[in-house]
């Protein structure tokens, strides 16, 4: 039975799914907006928003905690020095998902995911 198992499979096995979501986290922090399928964007939001909450307090233990999940010093530096302080007065809702229609070819529903207070346009 599948009781209390949360998350989407996204048509991949667990190791592929974990590495794909980790790469998407890195891309979103680096570029502050990415274009992906709606289901991947929703899954990414569930993973990244708690990391942003942790990054609002810049301590060595928080850095190590996030490093265990991301493993990229450049991204961790940007997360703690740029993105975390940007959301100090905000409690959640750091990411917004903007639907952008269907993809030509396989008709998958596409969306943009971005930080709510980013200066970059679509």
From Swiss-Prot:
<keyword id="KW-0689">Ribosomal protein</keyword>
<keyword id="KW-0687">Ribonucleoprotein</keyword>
<dbReference type="InterPro" id="IPR047859">
    <property type="entry name" value="Ribosomal_bL17_CS"/>
</dbReference>
<dbReference type="GO" id="GO:0003735">
    <property type="term" value="F:structural constituent of ribosome"/>
</dbReference>
<dbReference type="Pfam" id="PF01196">
    <property type="entry name" value="Ribosomal_L17"/>
</dbReference>
<comment type="similarity">
    <text>Belongs to the bacterial ribosomal protein bL17 family.</text>
</comment>
<protein>
    <recommendedName>
        <fullName>Large ribosomal subunit protein bL17</fullName>
    </recommendedName>
</protein>
<dbReference type="InterPro" id="IPR000456">
    <property type="entry name" value="Ribosomal_bL17"/>
</dbReference>
<dbReference type="InterPro" id="IPR036373">
    <property type="entry name" value="Ribosomal_bL17_sf"/>
</dbReference>
<dbReference type="GO" id="GO:0006412">
    <property type="term" value="P:translation"/>
</dbReference>
<comment type="subunit">
    <text>Part of the 50S ribosomal subunit. Contacts protein L32.</text>
</comment>
<dbReference type="GO" id="GO:0022625">
    <property type="term" value="C:cytosolic large ribosomal subunit"/>
</dbReference>
């Amino acid at each position: 039975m599948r009781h209390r198992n949360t998350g989407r499979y996204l048509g991949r096995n667990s190791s592929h799914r974990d590495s794909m979501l980790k790469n998407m986290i890195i891309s979103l922090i680096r570029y502050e907006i990415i274009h992906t399928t709606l289901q991947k964007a929703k899954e990414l939001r569930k993973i990244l928003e708690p990391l942003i909450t942790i990054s609002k307090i810049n301590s060595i233990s928080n850095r190590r905690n996030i490093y265990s999940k991301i493993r990229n010093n450049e991204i961790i530096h940007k997360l703690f020095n740029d993105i975390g302080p940007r959301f100090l007065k905000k409690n959640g809702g750091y990411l917004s998902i903007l639907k952008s229609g269907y993809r030509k070819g396989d008709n998958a529903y596409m969306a943009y995911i971005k930080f709510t207070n980013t200066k970059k346009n679509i």
